[in-house]
Amino acid sequence: MSDGWSRRSVLKSSLGLSLAGVSLSGTTETVTGASEYETLRQRWAQLLTGGDFDATQFEYQDPLAELDETAQDHWETMDTSADRDRLWSDLPIPASSSASASESNITDSYGRLQEMAMAYATNGSSLEDDSALVADIVDGLDFLYDRVYNEDQSQFGNWWHWEIGSPMRLVSVCALVGDELSSTQETNYTNAVGAHTGTPYEYTEYDVTSGGANRVDMCIITALRGAISGTDSTIALARDCIEESDIFQYNTSGGGNGLYRDGSYVYHKEIPYIGSYGAILLEGLGELFTVLDGTTWEITDVDHDVIYDAVGDAVAPFMYRGLMMDAVSGRSISRADQTDHVRGHGITATVLRLANTAPEPYASEFRSLAKGWIENDTWDSFLSDADVPDIANATAVLDDSTISAADEPVRHDVFHNMDRVVHNRSEWAYTISMCSERIARYEAINEENLRGWYTGAGMTQLYNDDLGHYTDGYWPTVDPYRLPGTTVDTRERSTLDGTHHPRPSTQWVGGASVDEFGIAGMEFDAEGASLTGKKSWLHLDDTVVALGADITSSDGRPIETTVENRNLHTDGSETLTVDDTEKSTTPDWSETLTDVSWAHLDGVGGYLFPNQPTLEAKREERTGSWQEINAGGPSESLTREY
């Protein structure tokens, strides 16, 4: 992934954009016969390029310029010599598992060819229909086929690059360059893809049943392989595989992956993930619906409503003014290029795409939700970092006066199957991230979320008018031992190298709601310590009441409960008032406060303490980098005040 903040700078693994060529009425033209193969290819190409749009409109100027610059740079730095052993000097191509180069370089090489192909096929690009460019693109495909990605090559390293990453990019390039490929080249490339992604039912390398977003991606790859090779049975395999999956069924087993009737979405068996893996699942389904709709292979033998209902039941509660909340985004919160607004914008684009094929009343609901999210995001404009196809879909909705933007919801939701609670008001929202014998305390894998120890330990997050609070360097700079809402043993923790998703043994975790109000409770025990206790929260109209009881520990170390820990960004000018006394705004201030009745932090809200406790308060400058919490993140140091 790129270290940049723009969605345009990130080539998403599922390659999901939106389709401008589908009418807003939610229907597509029904096609039959041999033309259907070309229809599928063209639809996928439109998903990537935006199809036919007015490239002179100012909204498209920046993304087109960025696409041109990226493609031109790839082209100029591409090695086209006859004796080359790689396409780009920084992406050596491994030939076996013993090579020092990573198999990810194969995927990245296909990715650069795809970006070049997108410029070639995008309306208004300075490289549109450039014959020299497309010749070098096809030459690059031939090189990768001859060198490493072919039907005779055994897989090595991470399976994903062989079965999803590289083939998704390869079939996308084929769809984009169209008639520039010979029949021999089409056969070679589709045979290579078929060898590594033979059936979407299972992973080729591990003979394990596929599921979730991976299943959807593999079905997309298979459908496009069939369209490129002109093989009806291959496209039918993709359709059958998605129809026979459990994606369109609620999980009723009481645990594990999938969507639940209460709106929960769990992935990796025990992680709340609608903001990441769940979003990718919806994105891929929107693409697959779009490509196959109205064709011989249209997806019909499923309950589409399970997916369409998920937008309102699983996604919308965790969307706040255009951002996707961290509580359901797992380890992705540690990624510099996947902030809450970036994730929210991606989901907005997905919902707009789903609206193109969804029936009423879903289609109107989706456009209304998306319009509200776009218009209410005053921190990070959707259009400022959108891709060309996303802009086409969004502007069609924004410019339509008959579509009303949805207001921020006033609702309370308890997600029993993933130990999450969200309390939405018109001007603020509040989430609680809990854990139990069902749901893990946190997830840390692939050297990501290295300090996420307490993100599921009753962590609370308040969303208000400061829409950049969790976006602006929060996770690399916040004290990971002092997340709001948590009660922790202050023992020193080790960085979470390896794979970690521990669950406690507690069962008493959940909540209940009446209309837009609710209560939540959590019995907790500390990982690696004797600390135990109980917590409850009452969610009212303008107040959240937090209670603690039976909090005990026998380890002899200090136990801390963090009431609040706000990101004051780089200036830290907000005033803290305690019992009518304004406290210092200098970053090094700290004080023991006794008999506290109330406190107020400008721009946030008030805090009442009926028992008049003793509190420790401080302001501090904290410095950290994304790389410290995610090995793949940028090393640049960030400093924020708290």
Task: Describe each region flagged by the PLM.
Residues 16, 34-104:
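Low-complexity, Ser/Thr/Pro/Gly-enriched N-terminal "stalk/linker" regions
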Residues 14, 112, 433-434:
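Glycine-rich, histidine-containing beta strand-loop boundary motifs that form or position
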Residues 7-8, 40-43, 535:
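Short, cationic motifs built from Arg/Lys/His that form the positively charged side of catalytic pockets
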Residues 2, 9-29:
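N-terminal export signals
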Residues 37-41, 186, 347:
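Short amphipathic alpha-helical segments that mediate assembly, nucleic-acid/protein binding
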Residues 75-336:
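Aromatic-lined, polymer-binding surfaces characteristic
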Residues 35, 39, 58, 62, ...:
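Alpha-helix boundary/N-cap detector
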